[in-house]
UniProtKB/Swiss-Prot annotation:
PANTHER family: LARGE RIBOSOMAL SUBUNIT PROTEIN BL34M, MITOCHONDRIAL RIBOSOMAL PROTEIN 34 FAMILY MEMBER. Coiled coil: none annotated. The keyword Ribonucleoprotein applies. GO terms for cellular component: ribonucleoprotein complex; ribosome. GO terms for molecular function: structural constituent of ribosome. The keyword ATP-binding does not apply. Disulfide bonds: none annotated. Keywords: Ribonucleoprotein, Ribosomal protein. One of its GO terms (biological process) is translation. It comes from Methylobacterium radiotolerans (strain ATCC 27329 / DSM 1819 / JCM 2831 / NBRC 15690 / NCIMB 10815 / 0-1). This is Large ribosomal subunit protein bL34.
């Protein structure tokens, strides 16, 4: 059985990156919550 996590920088950016978050209302809420919490890194 292969491992479930097969790292890829491109897929990581496309699925969890800043622009992917900003593309949906829910994603924008995620960014807003992380900003409010004072996160150093907002997205992948």
């Amino acid at each position: 059985m292969k491992r479930t996590y097969q790292p890829s920088k491109l897929v990581r950016k496309r699925r969890h990156g800043f622009r992917a978050r900003m593309a949906t209302a829910g994603g924008r809420k995620v960014i807003a919550r992380r900003r409010a919490h004072g996160r150093k890194r907002l997205s992948a």
